[in-house]
């Protein structure tokens, strides 16, 4: 008789894990504590809620995130199917309407005959075949039990969400529509700054007052979602080479590159909401209004949501995990998602896909499998389980963790495309060999 699987948490990783398990013909009990109990970062009860940006990053095969998406599509990923269906214009990136996207994921799982949804908080690791995908905001009780199980303290860092503005409140005479280097369709609103405007803004930003941290939080940040004020504290040049870099964003009205540019990205399908790209923040709300209104075109901006900041936790995976996403101590227990040390929406969902498929195999009496290291999913699983225990940090999908090609290709784009083509070939063969 085929065993059933518990999946704890219906975020990106948990939703994907449950979907993959169910599609293998295995019964799933999907536990989600919302809406009975909310986290500091979630705003609704839908599954797979995007709590930071609405962008799933690049969609091209010359980019590691684009390759990861394509690998997931090979396995009929619920996250990728829903993202593709509810995409909004974002140049060469894949961005989604966050409301309709998460609603689609929720409805698909509710309607799957092999999925049972249970709305309750789990405060200790269950017995039996289980995938824990409770994410960076794992409840205190469960986090305590996980720490007891792993025998190691969790590491802490922060994710920070950018403000969302009403497009109708922006001064369209001061901003212009363009994607960097004109890649894809012109999907970003760009607010150009002169040198004086930039330094006036910068000087106010570094003086702005931040919200008080909780006593369990410290000042560790992950580079991928660093607050804008923390970037500014490292110097003006850090901003000019980071989120405010003007390269490839010539102002069509002058034909010249501005001194600095703030980009705004469409946040919903209707196109009436925009978020400020790279402006995740922990500033007090009044300070956000004051300082961000100094950006040209945003003088009278209406904030639909101010930026917020919240704690994240992740395991020391090289010490705790195997490349199958099983734990070393208990082979019927899997972890998936950001708490394993993969960083990013797509990476989290991909780890859920990987863990879910292996949990389904065990439920069917089969051995778990390790994805080929030439694939991005396989490379990430290998990295998080073989990295230095002492210096382990979260990681995004990147070509640096994938084995090199045998042939030497100087052109970076051509090389990346060749790596992606090899990965897609490997993953299709791997799927045909191991999964129905």
UniProtKB/Swiss-Prot annotation:
Single GO term (MF): tRNA (uracil(54)-C5)-methyltransferase activity, 5,10-methylenetetrahydrofolate-dependent
Query: Which cofactors must be present for this protein to function?
Result: FAD
Please give one Pfam family short name.
GIDA
- From the Swiss-Prot or TrEMBL record, state where the protein is found: Cytoplasm
Highest taxon of the lineage: Bacteria
Instruction: Provide GO CC annotations from the record.
Output: cytosol
* HAMAP family according to UniProt: TrmFO
Name this protein carries in UniProt: Methylenetetrahydrofolate--tRNA-(uracil-5-)-methyltransferase TrmFO
Give the originating organism. Ligilactobacillus salivarius (strain UCC118) (Lactobacillus salivarius)
């Amino acid at each position: 008789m085929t065993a059933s699987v518990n999946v704890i948490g219906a975020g990106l990783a948990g939703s994907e894990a449950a979907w993959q398990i169910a599609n293998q013909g295995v019964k799933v009990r999907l536990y989600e504590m919302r809406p009975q109990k909310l986290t500091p970062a979630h705003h609704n009860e839908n599954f797979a809620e995007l709590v930071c940006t609405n962008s799933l990053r690049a969609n091209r095969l010359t980019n590691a995130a684009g390759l990861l998406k394509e690998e997931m599509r090979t396995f009929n990923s619920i996250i990728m199917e829903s993202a593709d269906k509810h995409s909004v214009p974002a140049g060469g990136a894949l961005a989604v309407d966050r409301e309709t996207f998460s609603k689609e994921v929720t409805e698909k799982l509710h309607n799957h005959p092999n999925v049972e949804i249970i709305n309750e908080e789990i405060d200790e690791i269950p017995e039996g075949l289980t995938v824990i995908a409770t994410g960076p905001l794992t409840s205190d009780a469960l986090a305590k039990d996980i720490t007891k199980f792993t025998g190691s303290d969790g590491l802490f860092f922060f994710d920070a969400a950018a403000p969302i503005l009403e497009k109708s409140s922006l001064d369209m005479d001061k901003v212009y529509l363009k994607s960097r280097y004109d890649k894809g369709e012109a999907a970003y609103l760009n607010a150009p700054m002169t040198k004086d405007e930039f330094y006036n803004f910068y000087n106010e930003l570094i003086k702005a007052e931040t919200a008080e941290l909780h006593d369990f939080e410290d000042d560790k940040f992950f580079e991928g979602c660093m607050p804008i004020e923390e970037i500014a504290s490292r110097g003006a040049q850090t901003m000019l080479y980071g989120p405010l870099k003007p390269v490839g964003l010539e102002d069509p009205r002058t034909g010249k590159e501005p001194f600095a540019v703030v980009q705004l990205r469409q946040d919903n399908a209707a196109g009436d909401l925009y978020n400020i790209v790279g402006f995740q923040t922990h500033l007090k709300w009044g300070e956000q209004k004051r300082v961000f209104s100094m950006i040209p075109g945003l003088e009278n901006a209406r904030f639909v949501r101010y930026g917020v900041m919240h704690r994240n936790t992740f395991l020391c995976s090289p010490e705790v995990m195997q490349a199958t996403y099983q734990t070393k101590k208990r082979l019927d227990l899997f972890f998936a998602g950001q708490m394993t040390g993969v960083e990013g929406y797509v990476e989290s969902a991909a780890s859920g896909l990987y863990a879910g498929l292996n949990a389904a195999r065990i439920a069917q009496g089969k051995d778990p499998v390790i994805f080929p290291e030439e694939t991005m999913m396989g490379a990430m699983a290998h990295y998080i389980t073989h990295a230095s225990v002492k210096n382990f940090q979260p990681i995004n999908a990147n070509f640096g963790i994938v084995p090199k090609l045998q042939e030497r290709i100087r052109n970076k784009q051509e090389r990346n495309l060749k790596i992606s083509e090899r990965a897609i070939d490997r993953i299709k063969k791997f799927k045909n060999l191991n999964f129905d």
